[in-house]
Amino acid sequence: MSVNIAKPIIIQIKDTRDELDFFETVSLPAEDEKTQEIIMNFPTVYIHNWQDSGDFEVYVGESNDIFKRTRQHYDAALDKKRWQSKLLEKDARLFIIGHEHFNKSLTLDIENRLMHYMMSVDRVKHVHNLRDNPQTSYYPMEELDEIFSKIWRGLRKENKELFPTESKIKDSAIYKASPLHKLTKDQEKARNLIIQKVFMAMENGEKQLIFIDGEAGTGKTVLNSSTFYELYCLAEESNKELSCHILKLSKHK
């Protein structure tokens, strides 16, 4: 990978409407023109975070207009049933992340990987958005890994508790079994078929037993976690009641 990839722009502010207004009207105009251009006119990724009983809760998002999107979150904070209400109750912080190579597809993949990582952080007890949206082929997809690592290292400089080392993340059991791993085409095909069968059985009031068979190392654990996670999300979106039980049988010694 080229060593010429620029560092990301990472800005941390207090997560309040007044601080956002100050950043937009005072702090940002004082930055160099390139920084202003990237934050104002490029897609950005953002992380709302706050502490509750010592541990962190986070919301990760991406937007083509960070100021409009953040104000929408503040408007939603008046509803006590929504996660945004925590922004009024807690000493929340907001990270705004920009890069000169960001486009919609790249920011979606960065957002997805940030959620993936945050799920695996010991000090994070709740990630409030967990619907992944992995991208396929786009430019500059080949820069994703390096840009993300630069972002993570930059975030770690701001808060080492919230952002542990990448090696620690990747060694965790939660990360290895995360439902947000990008699936292969065969895994995605199998997942979609299982979900189709499950919802058909639910609609018809039937019972069904589904087996996933495969050798060790073929991705059964990731397929399982991804399938159950997607089932949960779809059921929640359609207001369907769903309880899941996993029976894992192993022939490997």
Please report, for each region that a protein language model flagged, where it lies by residue:
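Conserved short loop/helix modules at catalytic or binding sites
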Residues: 66-113
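Hydrophobic anchor at the beta1->P-loop junction of P-loop NTPases
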Residues: 212-214
